Amino acid sequence: MLRKAIADIQAKYVRKDVPELRSGDSVRVHTKIKEGDKERIQVFEGVVIAYRRGTPGSSMFTVRKMSYGVGVERMFPVHSPRIDRIEVTGHGEVRRSRLYYLRGLQGKAARLHQEEGPSSAAPASTPPAAAPQA
């Protein structure tokens, strides 16, 4: 009985605009920051190193970025009202669901190989046929 009541309350706060996230994705998380009486949007850009799925109230993902040579990790509740939006900017090719090994890597070794997707480049158009010279 209590579980159903909790599930009903959580269902009201579930976000519908959450993109499909996976470990290795490059994301930009736009969060609402309140400073005094003003509110602004702050962007945190990095790689998803862990995604814990569960009930809507408990699902979270961890994003890691390098800031001036220091690794910064931040955990975000997926359905938080403080998150304005989540943009997926790329998909890394990984074979693990938790990428905690990236913590021990530095420089180019910490980069992930980006998945090859459909080419976004437009096909080359053929040049117009030249008029016959008379």
From Swiss-Prot:
Q: Name one GO biological process term.
A: translation
Gene Ontology cellular-component terms listed: cytosolic large ribosomal subunit
Is Ribosomal protein among the key words of this record?
A: yes
Positions of region (Disordered): 110-134
Q: What segments bear the compositional bias annotation Pro residues? A: 125-134
Q: Which family does it belong to?
A: Belongs to the bacterial ribosomal protein bL19 family.
What this chain does, per the entry, is described as: This protein is located at the 30S-50S ribosomal subunit interface and may play a role in the structure and function of the aminoacyl-tRNA binding site.
What is the protein name stated in its UniProt record? Large ribosomal subunit protein bL19
Q: Which organism is it from?
A: Anaeromyxobacter sp. (strain Fw109-5)
Tell me the name of the encoding gene: rplS
